[in-house]
Design a protein with these regions (language model features):
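Conserved G1/Walker A P-loop phosphate-binding module
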Residues: 1-111, 139
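Conserved C-terminal guanine-recognition region of P-loop GTPase G domains, centered on the G4
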Residues: 59, 85-202
Length: 202
């Protein structure tokens, strides 16, 4: 499993990454300390695997691992390329789930990118940028298949789904709250879009 650690600049993403992975990623009191993603792999202890290894006299026991990715900070306007926006969003698309770090503490020595501490605002900023990015993905797909959909029933069906999900996002909702139903084609297309707001969030 691959988890992406995301949040605004300077909220402690790299500090959390270092705590989880025992890595030595740079962590400093200025925005965009992290530019290229830091990657760390952590083994997951499991007594059941150890016990099975003993029972079957396994020569080698390979535990499950979690890959953590410390991703550059996001700012308002990232979906339009502000800050390291495009790079940030591309890095998030590669992960299985998002670990969202939100600053809830006051410290005048640590700069906040928006000048004040407001966790609810910060969460909304991140969520909106992810939503805007997903809308852009769907707009590109809709534009690509709209003409062909007039003569292709399968594409017409996909177009209907893409437009419905886009409308859901435009209402301010995350893709994961869209009621997809059990249609296998819809499920396959939805997965293909790889929408950021469809990913699990911790």
């Amino acid at each position: 499993m691959k988890l992406g650690i995301v949040g605004l600049p300077n909220v402690g993403k790299s500090t959390l990454f270092n705590s989880l992975t025992k890595a030595g990623a740079e962590s400093a009191n200025y925005p965009f300390c992290t530019i290229d993603p830091n990657v760390g792999i952590v083994s997951v202890p499991d007594e059941r695997i150890d016990r099975l290894g003993e029972l079957y006299h396994s020569k080698k026991i390979v535990p499950a691992v979690i890959e953590f990715v410390d991703i550059a900070g996001l700012v308002k306007g990232a979906s339009k390329g502000e800050g390291l926006g495009n790079q940030f969003l591309a890095n998030i698309r590669e992960v299985d789930a998002i670990v969202h770090v939100v600053r809830c503490f006051e410290d005048e020595n640590i700069v906040h990118v928006d000048g004040s501490i407001d966790p609810a605002r910060d969460i909304e900023t991140i969520n909106l940028e992810l939503i805007f990015s997903d809308i852009e993905i769907l707009e590109r797909r809709i534009s690509k298949i709209a003409k062909q959909a007039r003569m292709d029933k399968t594409l017409a069906k996909e177009l209907k789904l893409a437009e419905a999900v886009k409308a859901h996002l435009e209402d301010g909702h995350m893709a994961k709250t869209y009621e997809l139903g059990e249609d296998e084609d819809d499920q396959a297309w939805f997965k293909m879009y790889n929408l950021l707001t469809a990913k699990p969030v911790i």
